[in-house]
Amino acid sequence: MKYLPLFHNLRGSRVLVVGGGEIALRKSRLLADAGALLRVVAPEIEAQLRELVAASGGECLLRGYAEADLDGCGLIIAATDDEALNAHVSADAHRRCVPVNVVDAPALCSVIFPAIVDRSPLIIAVSSGGDAPVLARLIRAKIETWIPSTYGHLAGLAARFRDQVKGLFPDVQQRRGFWEDVFQGPIADRQLAGQGAEAERLLQAKIDGEAMVTTGEVYLVGAGPGDPDLLTFRALRLMQQADVVLYDRLVAPAILELCRRDAERVYVGKRRADHAVPQDQINQQLVDLAKAGKRVVRLKGGDPFIFGRGGEEIEELAAHGIPFQVVPGITAASGCAAYAGIPLTHRDYAQSVRFVTGHLKDGSTDLPWSDLVAPAQTLVFYMGLVGLPIICEQLIKHGRAAETPAALIQQGTTVNQRVFTGTLADLPRLVAEHEVHAPTLVIVGEVVQLREKLAWFEGAQGQI
């Protein structure tokens, strides 16, 4: 081990920073966040650095460095572009046995700064010992995606109850077992879900010896339009801790593969007028699985609250007192339009956008047509393929120009994406001619003409 990792309490301690430029500013921000009192020495000091020092109760010395500047300082930072000066500062600090860091010069350092993941009070440090700082930063970036920001709140919860638990369990092994149970169970789940008051109530009940009810939880997760890279960090984390996954037809196989390997997978997909599993049965499955203590991911394509019937499902959960979380996803309109190079709004073409379902609960296409032909408006139709001839006919009948630019986006955001553009009157012909099938999004509006300039993503199937 080249360096021993330690965490230094700098709160209220004087730290000397030699240098007044951008590098000194970056180091000083980190030190100020840790509560250090800054003493910055340089002939010239950037305005932002001066403001930072003033806000932290430190001092700026507009002159060259002198060894006496080390007096009373518990840490020294040399952050200038003068190698000789940096070496001089390092030698002075070593002679006084004061920890010193020289930026980009590991050989002159007695301490080095790691790459930091801050989930205060939880802190994770990654270091390559100065040999590969870029690699350390890349690893930190990966850890940032694995550890949610709410883990800091979880550590804070433990801190508030630490003394109670220590009094209850004098034995170290007992305390460790208690906290392991807390951090891997429903108490942690409540805190990570942002339900701090409920987490505190459950933890106090556990300390008081009350029996824990083993109700599971349901995570209603939006899987986005198809590209796995469009999943949120939160969605991925919950998918990887679920015991059971109930998934729809529109969830891409590549996304399903990101779920926990040993999770039970249950297909509950639906097509128009062909529901593999009726909605009320899906609702009951969610309730039953949660009551059995399972952590259940209900995985839906796009966003669960935009034509996804997510509201119906969590109404049922709420009626049975089942804990749930909702994780929004990128809806098909946003994702598919972006990957097709079609901005849904544009100052010159559309000041509003309207998301419309292509068929209603009873299977009809009875829509408020007079509202849908307003000028400077983009229309996006979900599930509109079957009713497309009626949609085009009614829009034209109610005043939308037959030559209005329009697009069909099949399997948007995936390698199988196909995009067909034409006019509103052309759409039914394009569907028949190119054998377009679901899932396909329909966009109507002047913004479609921008695709010719803005298209950037080309799926394996090409576009017309």
Curated annotation (Swiss-Prot):
It comes from Pseudomonas fluorescens (strain Pf0-1). HAMAP family: Siroheme_synth (MF_01646). Pfam families: CysG_dimeriser, NAD_binding_7, Sirohm_synth_M, TP_methylase. Residues 216-464 are annotated as: Uroporphyrinogen-III C-methyltransferase. GO terms for biological process: cobalamin biosynthetic process; methylation; siroheme biosynthetic process. One of its GO terms (molecular function) is uroporphyrin-III C-methyltransferase activity. Gene3D superfamilies: Cobalt-precorrin-4 Transmethylase, Domain 1, Methyltransferase, Cobalt-precorrin-4 Transmethylase, Domain 2, NAD(P)-binding Rossmann-like Domain, Sirohaem synthase, dimerisation domain, Siroheme synthase, domain 2. Then it catalyzes the NAD-dependent ring dehydrogenation of precorrin-2 to yield sirohydrochlorin. Finally, it catalyzes the ferrochelation of sirohydrochlorin to yield siroheme. In the N-terminal section; belongs to the precorrin-2 dehydrogenase / sirohydrochlorin ferrochelatase family. In the C-terminal section; belongs to the precorrin methyltransferase family. It catalyses: uroporphyrinogen III + 2 S-adenosyl-L-methionine = precorrin-2 + 2 S-adenosyl-L-homocysteine + H(+); precorrin-2 + NAD(+) = sirohydrochlorin + NADH + 2 H(+); siroheme + 2 H(+) = sirohydrochlorin + Fe(2+). This is Siroheme synthase. NAD(+) binds at E22, I23, P43, E44. S-adenosyl-L-methionine binds at P225, G301, G302, D303, I306, T331, A332, M383, G412. Residues 1-203 are annotated as: Precorrin-2 dehydrogenase /sirohydrochlorin ferrochelatase. The keyword NAD applies. The active site is at D248, K270. Pathway: Cofactor biosynthesis; adenosylcobalamin biosynthesis; precorrin-2 from uroporphyrinogen III: step 1/1; Cofactor biosynthesis; adenosylcobalamin biosynthesis; sirohydrochlorin from precorrin-2: step 1/1; Porphyrin-containing compound metabolism; siroheme biosynthesis; precorrin-2 from uroporphyrinogen III: step 1/1; Porphyrin-containing compound metabolism; siroheme biosynthesis; siroheme from sirohydrochlorin: step 1/1. SUPFAM superfamilies: NAD(P)-binding Rossmann-fold domains (SSF51735), Siroheme synthase middle domains-like (SSF75615), Tetrapyrrole methylase (SSF53790). Its EC number is 2.1.1.107, 1.3.1.76, 4.99.1.4. Keywords: Cobalamin biosynthesis, Lyase, Methyltransferase, Multifunctional enzyme, NAD, Oxidoreductase, Phosphoprotein, Porphyrin biosynthesis, S-adenosyl-L-methionine, Transferase.
